[in-house]
Amino acid sequence: MKKSILFIFLSVLSFSPFAQDAKPVESSKEKITLESKKCNIAKKSNKSGPESMNSSNYCCELCCNPACTGCY
């Protein structure tokens, strides 16, 4: 019985503000900047197969992922 009460007490205590780090969010050292890019979607080529699947335009047409080359 004592062990269960202690377990419940520690569980509740872990969610209290005393158990959590109280640093403000602005104090983080990492700064993230977002860049918006336009997708130049080229006309679909008549190619089919792995050659067209690996092209940068295919990646751009799917999701405009900024990590893809040719997706600007």
UniProtKB/Swiss-Prot annotation:
Alphabetized GO MF terms: toxin activity
Its Gene Ontology cellular component terms are: extracellular space
Q: Which UniProt keywords apply?
A: Disulfide bond, Enterotoxin, Pharmaceutical, Secreted, Signal, Toxin, Virulence
Which cysteines does the record link by disulfide bonds?
C59-C64, C60-C68, C63-C71
**InterPro entries attached here?**
Heat-stable_enterotox_CS, Heat-stable_enterotox_STa
The record ties this protein, via PROSITE patterns, to:
ENTEROTOXIN_H_STABLE (PS00273)
Tell where it localizes: Secreted
Q: Which residues form the propeptide?
A: 20-53
Query: Signal peptide: which range, if any?
Result: 1-19
Q: Where is it predominantly found?
A: secreted
Q: Which family does it belong to?
A: Belongs to the heat-stable enterotoxin family.
This chain's function reads: Toxin which activates the particulate form of guanylate cyclase and increases cyclic GMP levels within the host intestinal epithelial cells.
Q: Could you identify this protein by its name?
A: Heat-stable enterotoxin A3/A4
Record the organism. Answer: Escherichia coli
Q: Which gene encodes it?
A: sta3
